[in-house]
Amino acid sequence: LVPGITKEFNDIDEAMRLGFNWAKGPFEMLEEIGVKNFFDKVDEYKGNKFLENLSNSKDENFYGERQKYTSIETLGKIKKTASSVDGNSSASIYRFNDFNIVEFTTKANALDYDSMDALKKATDKPLIIINESMQFSAGVNLTYTMEFANKNDFKSIEKFIKYFQETCKHLKYSKYPVISAPSGLTLGGGFEVLVQSNFVASHTNIVIGLVETIVGLIPAGGGCKEMLARWLNTEEAKKDPKYAPLKVFDIIGYGRTATSPVEAEPLKYLLPENKRIMNRNSLLEVSKKILNENKDFKAPNELTFNLPGKAVIDDMNKILEKLYNDKVILDHGLTVAKELAHVLSGGETTKDKTLTEDDLFKLELDAFMRLIETKQTQDRIKHTLATGKPLVN
């Protein structure tokens, strides 16, 4: 195996631990036994060049000094050494000398007001958003949202969405860099946190996307805004002002998801510069390395948008008319899609008018609030929470 498959013993140990759920790899165990004890128990090794060389070496340990085994620094290990622990019932903040970590702690790491509060409080230093559980975040906590909707307390929902937007903008333009290190589900609001982080170190096992339309809503935490920005930054969009809104309309409208970084990149859920990590246990180490490489970090400039308004709405309506006539979407599906179209078009604007990020946030918020107040969207959410399946209405 060494050096035929890999040059490092660590790689073999890592593969055996991850593949067979072992506590220690074979070379780690031999390291603990020691070279002398190992050969005291081995009867035949003549003819095996590797074992002969090892037997003749003067190393006391199996790895030797140069290849001494060093375990990977995972979240589970490092958080025990935090200088302080802060947070609430939805997220924990682990504070270290030169950076902070936020770990979501709700079921499926669904996001609520407290989750956002923890993120905002943790930006007083460079921040890594990472979880020990298998999911990054399944999105906004719909149960939390419906508790307010059932009481017709839509002002509380609006307050939460505004705070979500405010927090995500704060992450993006913080004095210090923010890194998201996702694994598993990274959907809806979870994606919106990621896309407004400054850096991404993504596990290759990831399910990522904006799926709000499935439950009768539209992304309202910056998802529409950021996807527009990414697609506007293409050669096609520079030639055709309708290109980016139509592309994002298709992606968000169908609730498209990707199941790997390779699939996510063509949708622009992830970008070429985002790190991809095969070993989930290495997410924290890679994130810390990114921080070390960006000591001179400066926050990006705020985005501006020039969107075509009614000119692209007409094209979107033609698409929706065909889908509706073909019964691909029903009455409320049409309503949701029209709200999405209004946001992505820029609303009452023309391509000569410049919109700010706050303008796009306002469009997202208004559309979200109009939808959450409808019985049909509430029916979709209740059905999904009860069955785990979408309701088509």
Predicted regions located by residue number:
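Short acidic/histidine-centered micro-motifs embedded in hydrophobic/aromatic stretches
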Residues: A15-G19, L267, T387
